[in-house]
Amino acid sequence: MTQVTVKQLADEVKTPVERLLQQMREAGLPHTAAEEHVSDSEKQSLLTHLKSSHKAKVEEPRKITLQRKTTSTLRVAGSKSISVEVRKKKVFVQRSPEEIEAERQRELEERRAVENAARQKAEEEAKRRAEEEARRQPAPVAEPVAAQAAAPAPAPVVEPVQEAPVATAAPAADARKKDEQRRPDKTRNDDNRRGGDGERKNAPHRASVKEKAPAPRVAPRTTDEESDGFRRGGRGKAKLKKRNAHGFQSPTGPVVRDVQIGETITVGELAQQMSVKAAEVIKFMFKLGTPATINQVLDQETAQLVAEELGHKVTLVSDTALEDSLAESLKFEGEAVARAPVVTVMGHVDHGKTSLLDYIRRAKVAAGEAGGITQHIGAYHVETERGMVTFLDTPGHAAFTAMRARGAKATDIVILVVAADDGVMPQTVEAVQHAQAAGVPLVVAVNKIDKPGADLDRIRSELSVHGVTSEDWGGDTPFVPVSAKMGTGVDDLLEAVLLQAEVLELKATPSAPGRGVVVESRLDKGRGPVATVLVQDGTLRQGDMVLVGSNYGRVRAMLDENGKPIKEAGPSIPVEILGLDGTPDAGDEMSVVADEKKAREVALFRQGKFREVKLARAHAGKLENIFESMGQEEKKTLNIVLKSDVRGSLEALQGALNGLGNDEVQVRVVGGGVGGITESDANLALASNAVLFGFNVRADAGARKIVEQEGLDMRYYNVIYDIIEDVKKALTGMLGSDVRENILGVAEVRDVFRSPKFGAIAGCMVIEGVVHRNRPIRVLREDIVIFEGELESLRRFKDDASEVRAGMECGIGVKSYNDVKVGDKIEVFEKVQVARSL
């Protein structure tokens, strides 16, 4: 045993001697001087005191881990047995006797306090109940009740507190204490309910206590605890589960929801956001005077009124928020450079637009168009001696108004082609209006200048009426005489176009992501949806993720106007792209996006918005026309299933066909699409009693088989005039015919004779036309019809005559009419059926 002095110990622990002596005195050691010796046991006592003063544990509790292993055999069918081994692990922590004793004393005090409070509460309750019984019952009966109530309640039997084993876990004791605090009157209820023989007593007392403090609607506590104890092998000493974890608590007040309302919302969606049934919303709207259905689309103001009246908080959401966030993410950064102009060729039909463009391209394009008429937009990029120019060729027919308007929006300069021998026509004026509305400069090309009768001044004069003034007359529009056939003036036309482009200072950023507009789209049988896109800014590359209107996809391949594959396309370059999930509408904007998820979200959002707008428009149309259609005969409808080669032609045809008809007949395009006529199209035509029209497309084998079997009417066209004329003829046939009366002749009665066979015979002079025998007549007296019948007898000089002309006399016998007088007029007429027209 080594001993050190107090001074040496102070140097060792680096503490002043005076402080160490003070701590030793506090620990109960007899040391008072620095030279006194300190033994190992005294050091241990000092250390124990210091640890206890710093609230540190004297000794780490020792842990005892017990593992139990139980093996059993489970017999199954087939004389087989399965050996099941159950392993259980339990950890015991040794605690100090002082802590155990303190814990036991604390629990005992808490239990006594709870029992005293419960006893006092029970006595008060019994006394109160006895007083109520005394008030309700007569006086003789009140005495025994009062005596019984005055009897002291039996004292609760306090179970002897068993001494907790040394290996009891501290968390289990804490959980048991909290559980007893949660259930303060369990012991009292058990003692009051059971007597010495275990019989239940004081049932009215329990009922009154239960009525005073109703329990919340939760699952019984014993269920969780007992099942948990069963799973743990019957030992319920582990931490008990939390009570009331999933209990249903009814709301104390009305629940206010945050309802987000866009520009449109259906009744069902509004009810779902407010967490009410759709029937309640419909009932409330009915009270407001607005009948509705569960799928009816409400506008923002109506939905806001309904939600606020029902007590909810409304947040108005812009439907374009998703698209706005996408637009903000598209950044066009980089150096802007000059780009080639996009030139649209417009004009009246057959004025030579495609021939002029054909001469510039030095390729025969007009021969490929049916009838020499442009059916859809063609986009071509041309390298000239003066630079690159991109041309858009638009149709000149009246049905393609929307396509010309789109061409004007996507262009920089418009070449207005006017035939010198034909002058300004309706589509010429329309092209001028489109260009002026889009703010695009015009260059007038007076074509067919080589023909005799060409008058350039007449063209200038007619266009000046519509706000297009020639430079020669002091205006700002160049007029260039050209001949697409001979090539005269084409160089001057290109010079004027490029001069206008220099004035516009057209710029683009090739390093930015591609952005453009859809010129045309179609469905190719072997390649799927194909879209012709004019890149307006940035660069479009193969493999880019693009968003086009309500469609999206990755560019799998790009082709130029000659059908050759290319890897990228810069500004003002028209290309065909493959890889979209559908055929976009002509005029849709195309943009390159980096995130496929974002593109899909915006595309689906636009599709849903289109459906909602379409549904709302259809419902509004029903409500508006419901009273107009009452009392009217149902319109005759010509149903048509229309398939076209490209999207632009389909839209133009649908617009032209829907414009036909009148109050009695109408055209309804029940189905339309891009691509060939398929079996499903034939089935649709069969179900809707429709006519199949194919514009520049053909039917497949399955569709032809159905058409032959069912006798459907299917027609192919390649010129839009033929479709419109045939539909007009069909509608005219559906109109039926009108009955028209033609007055053949008029005879004036000069005298009246009597005949035993015919009665009164009128001696007449034919003053107008020809009087025919066996024709219907009218008898007019002072120009008022008094009889309508049939001419029975017509004679001249006692001879029967088939007809009598003007200026001759004759005798007329009217069938079943004898009241003919001198001065009457007999009008002979015939009824003719005349075909009606639109």
Curated annotation (Swiss-Prot):
Cellular component terms, GO, for this chain's entry? cytosol
- What residues does the tr-type G domain cover? 338-507
Report whether Nucleotide-binding shows up as a keyword of the record.
Answer: yes
> Does Isomerase show up as a keyword for this record?
no
The UniProt annotation puts the region (G1) at 347-354
Q: Where is the composition biased (Basic and acidic residues)?
A: 33-43, 96-136, 174-214, 222-231
Q: Residue ranges under compositional bias (Low complexity)?
A: 137-173
Report residue spans for region: G2. Answer: 372-376
| Coiled-coil regions, chain positions | none
List GO molecular-function terms, semicolon-separated: GTP binding; GTPase activity; translation initiation factor activity
Cited function: One of the essential components for the initiation of protein synthesis. Protects formylmethionyl-tRNA from spontaneous hydrolysis and promotes its binding to the 30S ribosomal subunits. Also involved in the hydrolysis of GTP during the formation of the 70S ribosomal complex.
Q: Which family does it belong to?
A: Belongs to the TRAFAC class translation factor GTPase superfamily. Classic translation factor GTPase family. IF-2 subfamily.
Name by which UniProt lists this protein: Translation initiation factor IF-2
